[in-house]
């Protein structure tokens, strides 16, 4: 039920996708600024990540006893009161049924009321923290570091901002039939079917947070990944297997680069090919021969070997051409190699 309310809050507030809803009321106090959380991908087919709280802060995994001097600023964000009637049919309804924990038999909708009141935002002074961590090192003997380092799927993150309530808040849910009066009155002892539910939680409860990933180097230095492009994790030692995979990756990259070069050189050829045969009903071969000045010849008959076409550049094995023109000269040669159709005609059309 608490998870359903925090998910709805994050969805409505937005913040560019950086905000993460607090999944459980019992763990809300563990998502404070400078706290550490573990980020894991749920599975290969599920794009979203799962954040797990830890009992540690950034200071706990650093060498030395010096406190982190980066301050935390806070300000009022908004006044949040939400009442919504959600259908049980559909994607959002399926998610809410799993979160609210009430009996929905015979119901087609759920009325949800969340009263958070004024919420405040507490965030770490990023510039101050970035200056400070340049002289700090990670303690690799810390249990959290050892366990995270052994897992390739886990990424350590530091909480950079949290959103909290300022007063006692209430959440209430009622399952019913759309069209009925969806009133919020809750008497648990007189509600044996469990179709209504309400909770009250104290002030200063964290309902959402955002994180920066940590990238940790082999020497203990670390970086804060302040943009979504940067990815956290641990720098890996270069082993024999790692070196082999690195070389294999470079070989595949070089091969793909060569393929892309061939494609880029042949793009002009392909564009004109489709243009000629799909946009123009008349063959350009007939047009070029009407000029009478440039004639397509077989270069093999003149002791000139086959080779790549001067226009499209495609000249490997079966794509090499034996045709060309003696009236054109390129690169000091008194002939050019051109594919019979359509390169020969495209070349001469562009020379006009």
UniProtKB/Swiss-Prot annotation:
Keyword Translocase on entry: no
Entry keyword annotation includes S-adenosyl-L-methionine: no
Subcellular location: Peroxisome membrane; Cell projection, Cilium
Phenotypic consequence of residue 224 to R: In DFNB59; likely pathogenic
GO biological-process terms attached to the record: detection of mechanical stimulus involved in sensory perception of sound; pexophagy; programmed cell death in response to reactive oxygen species; regulation of peroxisome organization; response to reactive oxygen species; sensory perception of sound; stereocilium maintenance
GO cellular component annotations of the record: ciliary rootlet; cortical actin cytoskeleton; cytoplasm; neuronal cell body; peroxisomal membrane; stereocilium base
Domain of life, source organism: Eukaryota
Outcome following mutation: residue 54 to I: In DFNB59; causes hypervulnerability to sound
InterPro entries xref list: Gasdermin_pore, GSDME
Family recorded in the similarity comment: Belongs to the gasdermin family.
Additional remark text: 'Pejvakin' means 'echo' in Persian.
Subunit structure as annotated in this protein's UniProt entry: Interacts with MAP1LC3B; interaction is direct. Interacts with IQGAP1. Interacts with ROCK2. Interacts with TRIOBP.
Illness the protein is tied to: Deafness, autosomal recessive, 59: A form of sensorineural hearing impairment with absent or severely abnormal auditory brainstem response but normal otoacoustic emissions (auditory neuropathy or auditory dys-synchrony). Auditory neuropathies result from a lesion in the area including the inner hair cells, connections between the inner hair cells and the cochlear branch of the auditory nerve, the auditory nerve itself and auditory pathways of the brainstem.
Annotated protein name in UniProt: Pejvakin
């Amino acid at each position: 039920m608490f998870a359903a309310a925090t998910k709805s809050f994050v969805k409505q507030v937005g913040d560019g996708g950086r905000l993460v809803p607090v999944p459980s009321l019992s763990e809300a106090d563990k998502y404070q600024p400078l706290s550490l959380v573990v980020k894991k991908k749920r599975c290969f087919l599920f794009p979203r990540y799962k954040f797990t709280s830890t009992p540690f802060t950034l200071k706990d995994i650093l060498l030395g006893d010096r406190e982190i001097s980066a301050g935390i600023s806070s300000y009022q964000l908004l006044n949040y009161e939400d009442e919504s009637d959600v259908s049980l049919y559909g994607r959002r309804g399926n998610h809410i049924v799993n979160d609210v924990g009430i009996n929905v038999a015979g119901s087609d909708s759920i009325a949800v009321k969340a009263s958070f009141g004024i919420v405040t935002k507490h965030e770490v002074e990023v510039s101050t923290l970035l200056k400070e961590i340049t002289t700090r090192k990670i303690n690799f003997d810390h249990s959290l570091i050892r366990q995270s380092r052994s897992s390739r799927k886990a990424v350590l993150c530091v909480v950079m901002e949290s959103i909290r309530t300022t007063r006692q808040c209430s959440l209430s849910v009622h399952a019913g039939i759309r069209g009925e009066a969806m009133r919020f009155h809750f008497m648990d002892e007189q509600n044996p079917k469990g179709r209504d539910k309400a909770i009250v939680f104290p002030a200063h409860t964290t309902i959402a947070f955002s994180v920066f990933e940590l990238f940790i180097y082999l020497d203990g230095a670390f970086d804060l990944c302040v943009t979504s492009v940067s990815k956290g994790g641990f720098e890996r030692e270069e082993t024999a297997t790692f070196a082999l995979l690195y070389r294999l990756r470079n070989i595949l990259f070089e091969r793909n680069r060569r393929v892309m070069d061939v494609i880029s050189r042949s793009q002009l050829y392909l564009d004109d090919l489709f243009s000629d045969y799909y946009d123009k009903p008349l063959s350009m071969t007939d047009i070029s021969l009407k000029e009478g000045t440039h004639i397509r010849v077989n270069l093999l008959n003149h002791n000139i070997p086959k080779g790549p076409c001067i226009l499209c550049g495609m000249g490997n094995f079966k794509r090499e051409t034996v045709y060309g023109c003696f009236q054109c000269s390129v690169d000091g040669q008194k002939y050019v190699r051109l594919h019979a159709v359509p390169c020969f005609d495209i070349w001469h059309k562009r020379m006009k």
